[in-house]
Curated annotation (Swiss-Prot):
InterPro entries: ABC1_TM_dom (IPR011527), ABC1_TM_sf (IPR036640), ABC_transporter-like_ATP-bd (IPR003439), P-loop_NTPase (IPR027417), Type_1_exporter (IPR039421). This is ABC transporter B family member 7. Residues 167-489 form the ABC transmembrane type-1 domain. It holds the Pfam family ABC_tran. Belongs to the ABC transporter superfamily. ABCB family. The chain crosses the membrane at residues 164-184, 252-272, 325-345, 347-367, 431-451, 461-481. Residues 63-101 have a biased composition (Low complexity). It comes from Dictyostelium discoideum. GO terms for biological process: chemotaxis; transmembrane transport. It is found in: Membrane. GO terms for cellular component: membrane. Residues 41-101, 772-813 are annotated as: Disordered. ATP binds at G570, P571, S572, Q573, S574, K575, E576. One of its GO terms (molecular function) is ATP hydrolysis activity.
Length: 824
């Protein structure tokens, strides 16, 4: 990214302010010795004591003429043969090499804006910058990132680390509950086997001697002292009466259950609390990173994708921490413990089970690789459906007015049909896996049972224990597979989450050199292409022979001193992007924007924006809240009286106190507020901030509101004003006027200077357009006045007719009275 400077070093008399802006005379050092892979950065030093450049209008005009000539030459060169084109490319490469060789002498104003600055008071050290690889984040899709799985796991662990003691105690409780669950099958098997043995013994005695009648021995009549049995003894006695003499085993079962219950509670509570804490911090960092991204990032990414990252992906992370992680550890412990117990009981049967489990695991891995792309595709289609719903609901008025309901319905049905077709194959794969997995599980159980029978385990307690532990192991395998699936979703979601959290904004958000409050604003050979603003602009020199296709601004240079009024006119859309570059929302593709003598790429934009305000009805946003909250938005430290004073200056106070709750009345996007009143809220915000630089868009201001004109006239006093002019009075009061056409400045000067050239674009196009607008407005106003006068005349005639009718009625009534009196 290079440019040819258009600055002339002038004498001291031509420079209005020689003092360095905001930093006294202390030198500033930029250390650019960091190596980033193959990129070797040079060391650049500069001192603010040296004279700094300002723009010479004459040289800017000369450069404009040169650029026009260059464009003509480029057009001629495009008609030449391929050899000439090759020569041009070689010249471009040579020029690029020359410019790259001169980077050591260029001021740090031209430091590549992709670099991230560690701003300190007087020394800037680039060695601490943590660079983000260009391929680590895809600007246009959250579903295609090169974030590695290992890096995602490491980042998740960094968020878990502050809650480490929650997880330590949660895993301790989890281990105890798992041990209890491992002991239960052993106790149950012993109890059931003992009951079966006792019943078989009694049945054997009865069947061998049918003539012997066994009668219980009569209890002697002895008086004994009875005691109330404990709860444990009561439960044990009831169980014993049902299943035989298993008192010892059942006591252990009750003890295990009672021990397990509080640890189950602790496990769930600790995992849930830790999960909420981790996800809360993650969402905070995610939203903070989102707010610090440059505006062009939101231009190139869909709102629905960003909302899905904050809402859906973070919810997946929370579910994995609170549920899936616990399930993974629990099932792993149960699997390992169950296998160890089975090895202790019979190592031969255990080997058979392990062989079935290996087949199940391999099948799962193959299935996961097969179904994972389908899952990602379905997730992407779900996001598209969400976008259609958001757009349709948010723009329902426009859809209704344009009769576009059927079009939106067709789009929705198309996405639904695609989702339905994809879901059918996804469901078919899942159904196959569930049936195949169940077949493997049942085959494992049947194989173990058959092998155990062949090993003469059927007549011992080992067979029942084997079956119970086999069921536990297969259930653990199913739980492991489910938790691994959820963790795979977590990895996919965390790639999108951490790609956004770690993304370094192209336009720095905070920090930098603080400008003076009386700084001027200057553009030096500024080119801007919004389509390429997100990427490196290494190939810009190769694009010069393409007539600046796609450029919004081309070779724009001007300066506005403190207290001056600059007007921007012309049909080009470049005027709006002048505002965006001054606001620091974008960086220029080429060239430099200076605030004072400071490049916006190293400027403290946070401070500068506090001294800057834009009045444009199209950019005025009403937030959900009260009137007072909307006026003071971002300035919570101000008192209510400050709000009232600003509202009075904006001619808004009388309207607000007429509302049901005054300044506490709720407004927002869904409230039907008059556009004039919304504009007054914006003007009240400007009075409250008292900016030193005011950006004014007159193209959307109402012409017939005297209150708006009076409040703006009061606001612009003693301020630097840059206006997109649409009124003749504004042009007459301007210190300088820039006429834009075809994305470049074609004329400049005061109103009187530009008006003297009758054939100029300013006279033939701009003034005629403004006069036509005023004539139309005046004609409309005259027509309205004539209509009002006619209505008034008609009303007067009607009133006269009514008066005549009343007089006639009075005469008739008098005649009737006279006749009546005569008859009497």
């Amino acid at each position: 990214m290079t440019r040819k400077s258009n600055y002339n070093y002038l004498d001291e008399d031509n420079i209005e302010d020689e003092s360095p802006i905001g930093l006294g005379t202390s030198p500033i050092e930029f250390n650019l010795d960091k190596e980033n892979k193959n990129k070797k950065r040079n060391s650049v030093k500069f001192n603010l004591d040296t004279p700094l450049p300002i723009i010479n209008n004459k040289s800017s005009q000369d450069n404009n003429n040169k650029n026009n000539n260059n464009n003509n030459n480029n057009n001629n060169n495009n008609n030449n043969n391929n050899n000439n084109n090759n020569n041009n490319n070689n010249n471009n490469k040579n020029n690029k090499n020359k410019i790259n060789n001169s980077l050591n002498s260029i001021t740090p104003y031209l430091v590549d804006y992709k670099d991230d600055f560690d701003f300190k008071r007087s020394v800037y050290d680039f060695d601490d910058v943590d660079y983000l690889e260009e391929d680590s984040f895809d600007e246009h899709s959250f579903y295609k990132t090169s974030y590695s799985t290992r890096r995602c796991i490491y980042r998740i662990l960094t968020y878990i680390r502050p809650q480490i003691w929650y997880f330590v105690f949660a895993f301790l409780a989890l281990s105890i509950t798992t041990l209890c669950q491992l002991a239960l099958p052993y106790c149950f098997a012993n109890g059931i086997q003992e009951a079966i043995r006792v019943n078989l013994t009694v049945n054997s005695v009865n069947s061998t001697d049918n003539n012997i009648i066994i009668t219980p021995t009569p209890t002697p009549n002895i008086t004994t002292t009875t005691t109330n049995p404990t709860v444990l003894e009561s439960i044990t006695s009831k169980y014993t009466s049902l299943f035989g003499n298993t008192e010892y085993d059942f006591k252990w079962i009750i003890i295990i259950v009672l021990v397990q219950t509080p640890f189950l509670f602790a496990r769930y509570l600790l995992f849930t609390m830790a999960g909420f804490s981790v996800v809360t911090k993650l969402k905070r960092d995610l939203f903070k990173s989102l707010l610090t991204q440059e505006v062009s990032y939101f231009d190139s990414n869909r709102t629905g994708d960003l909302k899905a990252v904050i809402a859906s992906d973070s919810s997946i992370l929370q579910n994995c921490i609170t549920v899936s992680l616990s399930t993974l550890v629990r099932c792993s412990l149960q699997l390992i413990g169950g296998l160890l117990i089975l090895v202790f009981l019979s190592w031969k049967v255990t080997l058979l089970m392990i062989s079935f489990l290996v087949i199940l695991l391999i099948s799962f891995l193959v299935f996961k690789k097969w179904i994972h792309p389908k899952y990602n595709y379905i997730q992407e289609k779900l996001v598209n459906i969400g976008l259609i719903i958001d757009d349709s609901i948010g723009n329902i008025k426009e859809i209704r007015l344009l009769n576009a309901e059927s079009k939106e319905l067709r789009s929705f049905e198309t996405e639904l049909e695609i989702l339905h077709r994809s879901s059918r194959s996804f469901v078919l794969m899942n159904a196959f896996w569930i049936s195949f997995g169940s077949l493997l599980v049942m085959g494992t159980i049947i194989g173990i049972y058959g092998f155990a029978m062949s090993q003469t385990l059927s007549n011992s307690i080992l067979l029942l224990q084997f079956i119970l532990y086999s069921l536990m192991i297969t259930a653990s395998m199913n739980g492991l597979i489910g938790s691994i699936n959820e963790i795979q979703k977590l990895i996919s979601s965390s790639k999108r989450i951490f790609s956004l959290i770690d993304r370094k904004p192209i336009v720095h958000f905070q920090g930098g050199i603080t400008p003076s409050t009386d700084s001027n604003i200057s553009f030096d050979n500024v080119y801007f292409n919004n389509n390429n603003n997100n990427s490196n602009n290494n190939n810009n020199n190769n694009n010069n022979n393409k007539n600046n296709n796609g450029m919004i601004l081309s070779n724009v240079s001007f300066i506005v001193n403190k207290g001056q009024w600059l007007s921007l006119v012309g049909p080009s859309q470049s005027k709006e992007f002048i505002f965006s570059l001054i606001q620091g929302l974008y960086y220029p593709t080429r060239g430099t924007v200076f605030i004072g003598r400071i490049d916006t790429k190293v400027l403290d934009l946070y401070f500068f924006r506090s001294r800057l305000f834009t009045i444009s009805p199209l950019q005025t946003v009403i937030f959900d809240g009260t009137v007072e909250q909307n006026i003071r938005y971002g300035l919570s430290h101000l008192s209510t009286q400050n709000i009232i004073d600003a509202s009075k200056k904006a001619n808004l106070h009388d309207f607000v106190i007429g509302l049901p709750h005054g300044y506490d009345s709720m407004i927002g996007k869904n409230n039907f507020f008059d556009p004039i009143q919304i504009l007054k809220i914006s003007i009240a915000r400007a009075f409250l901030r008292n900016p030193s630089v005011l950006l004014l868009d007159e193209t959307t201001l109402p012409f017939d509101s005297k209150e708006i004109e009076d409040s703006i006239e009061l606001l612009v006093q003693n301020k630097t004003v840059i206006a997109i002019a649409n009124k003749l009075s504004t042009l007459k009061r301007s210190n300088n006027i820039l006429v834009f056409d075809d994305n470049r400045i074609i004329e400049r000067g005061t109103h009187s200077e530009l008006s003297q050239k009758s054939t100029s674009f300013y006279v033939t196009s701009v003034l005629n357009s403004i006069n036509n607008k005023y004539n139309n407005n005046n004609n409309n106003n005259n027509n309205n006045n004539n209509n009002n006068n006619n209505n008034n005349n008609n009303n007067n005639n009607n009133n006269n007719n009514n008066n005549n009718n009343n007089n006639n009625n009075n005469i008739n009534n008098n005649n009737k009275i006279e006749i009546y009196l005569f008859l009497i």
